């Protein structure tokens, strides 16, 4: 099965995506990861104002199949959490790249996305 991977995003090995606009990063979970998880029943996100460090756990996502950690793809401070998705996590699968974002992070320091993949590289990794 093939999924959408927008070219304007960067993708992490742990299946988070990042849309960087100036010093604000919008973070979410890829369509591939959502499909692998199945029906999502709960999302735990950090609080507004929390400091995040790249690679550290920043929350988790629970489905009928598993509970998986969500990792911070970038260093920064949480500006906003998508409370609509937290309140109705089943909607995440409907539009993961637009309305399905999880967090907005004010990036601290240079945007270190050197480990991030392009859309085509991520697609090759997950779809073989």
UniProtKB/Swiss-Prot annotation:
Q: Which residues carry this modification: N6-lipoyllysine?
A: 65
Q: Which UniProt keywords apply?
A: Lipoyl
Record InterPro entries: 2-oxoA_DH_lipoyl-BS, Biotin_lipoyl, GCV_H, GCV_H/Fam206, GCV_H_sub, Single_hybrid_motif
The Gene Ontology biological process annotation of the record reads: glycine decarboxylation via glycine cleavage system
> Which note does the record give on the cofactor?
Binds 1 lipoyl cofactor covalently.
Q: A Gene Ontology CC term for this entry?
A: cytosol
Q: Do you know which SUPFAM superfamilies this protein is assigned to?
A: Single hybrid motif
Q: Does the keyword Protease apply?
A: no
Q: Where is the Lipoyl-binding domain?
A: 24-106
Provide the cofactor list for this protein: (R)-lipoate
Domain of life, per lineage: Bacteria
Iron-sulfur among the record's keywords? Answer: no
Q: Name one Pfam family in it.
A: GCV_H
Q: What does this protein do?
A: The glycine cleavage system catalyzes the degradation of glycine. The H protein shuttles the methylamine group of glycine from the P protein to the T protein.
**Record HAMAP family:** GcvH
Q: How does it assemble?
A: The glycine cleavage system is composed of four proteins: P, T, L and H.
The entry's family comment says: Belongs to the GcvH family.
Q: Name the chain's protein.
A: Glycine cleavage system H protein
- Species the sequence originates in: Acaryochloris marina (strain MBIC 11017)
């Amino acid at each position: 099965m093939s999924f959408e991977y927008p070219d304007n995003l960067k993708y992490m090995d742990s299946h988070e995506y990042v849309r960087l606009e100036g010093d604000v990063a919008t973070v979410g979970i890829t369509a591939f990861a959502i499909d692998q998880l199945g029906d999502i029943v709960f999302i735990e996100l950090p609080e507004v104002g929390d400091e995040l460090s790249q690679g550290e756990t920043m929350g988790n996502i629970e489905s009928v199949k598993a509970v998986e950690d969500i990792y911070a793809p970038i260093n920064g401070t949480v500006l906003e959490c998508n409370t609509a998705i937290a309140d109705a996590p089943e909607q995440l699968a409907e539009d993961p790249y637009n309305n399905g974002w999880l967090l907005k992070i004010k990036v601290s320091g240079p945007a270190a996305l050197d480990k991030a993949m392009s859309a085509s590289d991520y697609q090759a990794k997950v779809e073989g």
